[in-house]
UniProtKB/Swiss-Prot annotation:
Any single Gene Ontology cellular-component annotation: phagophore assembly site membrane
UniProt name for this protein: Autophagy protein 16
Described purpose of this protein according to its UniProt entry: Stabilizes the ATG5-ATG12 conjugate and mediates the formation of the 350 kDa complex, which is necessary for autophagy. The ATG5-ATG12/ATG16 complex is required for efficient promotion of ATG8-conjugation to phosphatidylethanolamine and ATG8 localization to the pre-autophagosomal structure (PAS). Also recruits ATG3 to the PAS. Involved in endoplasmic reticulum-specific autophagic process and is essential for the survival of cells subjected to severe ER stress.
Subunit structure and binding partners: Homodimer. Part of the 350 kDa complex which is at least composed of ATG5, ATG12 and ATG16. Several units of each may be present in this complex. Interacts directly with ATG12.
Family recorded in the similarity comment: Belongs to the ATG16 family.
Effect on the protein of changing residue 104 to A: Significantly reduces autophagic activity
Gene name of the record: ATG16
Its membrane topology: Peripheral membrane protein
Length: 150
């Protein structure tokens, strides 16, 4: 019986396909792609520093530092969001696995109860048949006594 449960759990895990998890994965991929694009843009900003002259260097540097600070904050918030989404995905996967385990145990319990019901119905039929035979014999005995006294 233990092997049956393990086999059922393995089958449930293999058959598991959660569209919500797939969409979460797609969202994660899109956000990682956005992050890569922003990093590439940040690299472009640092490469274009050679053509500045005199006072423009300071204002250009300030603009780059501002942009860098903004992008770093955004990157940090996106990384936190990614971490949070990964935790949500892990929790949902755990809940899904727990639900599948409950379904499997419920199915097994249902099968056991169905077998018990079948056995009890069979036993009931046998008891009714024995009782009817006994009652028939008693009736025949009474009838023979009545016929014998007449």
């Amino acid at each position: 019986m233990g092997n049956f449960i393990i086999t059922e759990r393995k089958k449930a895990k293999e058959e598991r396909s959660n569209p919500q998890t797939d969409s979460m994965d797609d969202l994660l991929i899109r956000r990682l792609t956005d992050r890569n694009d922003k990093e590439a843009h940040l690299n472009e900003l640092f490469q274009d520093n050679s053509g500045a002259i005199g006072g423009n260097i300071v204002s250009h540097d300030d603009a780059l530092l501002n942009t860098l600070a903004i992008l770093q904050k955004e990157l940090k918030s996106k990384e936190q969001e990614i971490r949070r989404l990964k935790e949500v995905i892990a929790l949902k996967n755990k809940n899904t696995e727990r639900l599948n385990d409950e379904l499997i145990s419920g199915t097994i319990e249902n099968n056991v109860l169905q077998q018990k019901l079948s056995d009890l119905k069979k036993e009931h039929s046998q008891l009714v048949a024995r009782w009817l035979k006994k009652t028939e014999k008693e009736t025949e005995a009474m009838n023979s006594e009545i016929d014998g006294t007449k």
